[in-house]
Amino acid sequence: MSLPSIKTTNSYCVVLWCDQGSATINAPDRVVQVMAGDVVLAPHGAFVTGHGVVLPMAFPDFDGGEHTRRLHMGTAWSKRMIFEFSRSLLGETRPSECIAALFDDRARPPRVPEPQAARKVAQKLIAYPADQTPLLEFAQLHNISSRTLQRQFVASTGFTFSEWRAALRVSVAADLLAHDFRIGQVSQMVGFSATSSLTRAFKRHTGDTPSSFTSPRMHAVCEQQPPMIPATTTFARASDDIALWIYSGTATVTTPGYCRFMGAGETVTIPSGTSTRLDVSAGSVALPVPLAAAHDDLTLSDVLAASVNPLAAVELQRLSAQERADVEQVLVPSV
């Protein structure tokens, strides 16, 4: 299945879920290959190429940091992540707690230093974590003293150059271990001279060994069932005429003087500027689609193609607390 390249147009990080096939995430700091069941948190500027179905989710109030991170969650999470995609299209500003928690780990990459020379060194190491270039040589490349470069790292990140590099390697190693690479392989891939060196660095930066750090995390994410999809109620207004498609389950759409109960596969038109109440049942997913893109045989790929097209993308704005209070007595489901 061929889809257009996805470019993140927001100024904040984006969550990317590979639902089908495989693709490439081209992030500012690294290039990541993904397959079905992978979720990636990428900074502003990331774009997707390839033939997989990758759902981009933008959450303005979610600070995911400056580094790209990937987890393999398994395809059992598909419906739960499509629900998360729906939340982003319906105006939510933060991911669900269970999704945000996936990236709240002790192997988070270290902060990128701000001074120009140190930042360029950091960017080189982010692109090539196994690079063995010593501090002195990096300093000479940037025409500064090694002391100055060291001070830049410490002042901006709290780490010496060597510890910053170790912290970065630990973060990359955690990602590789999550994808079933052996510890010995990972040690070499990220630039440690021996498995024992990786283990010591892991203990310093996470408090655990690679095996004890990875196993509980991946058991929790990959082996357990994803959380149930909760029932949701959304009060919103569209900037343009849109169609609301029930991807799965059931939902009730209420506008002034109108109420409709809907099942999977059905669509309803919501005119521009109309205050709308959307009640989605537990276990169900509803997706807004530009009216021009709606048809009788919609697929997830159709919604994706429309959502990443800046000329057709749906803009659905949540009602403010005051606006919701004003319409709540009017928008009462009657079915």
Swiss-Prot record:
Induction of its expression: Repressed by DtxR under iron excess.
GO molecular function term, any single one: DNA-binding transcription factor activity
Keyword Repeat: no
One GO term of the biological process aspect: regulation of DNA-templated transcription
SMART domains, A to Z: HTH_ARAC (SM00342)
Top-level lineage group: Bacteria
Functional note: Under iron limitation, represses the acn (aconitase), catA (catechol 1,2 dioxygenase), leuCD (isopropylmalate dehydratase), narKGHJI (nitrite/nitrate transporter and nitrate reductase), sdhCAB (succinate dehydrogenase), pta (phosphotransacetylase) and katA (catalase) genes.
Protein name listed in UniProt: HTH-type transcriptional regulator RipA
Residue ranges of the annotated DNA-binding region, renumbered to this chain: 136-157, 183-206
Occurrences of domain HTH araC/xylS-type (ranges): 119-216
Record key words, sorted: DNA-binding, Repressor, Transcription, Transcription regulation
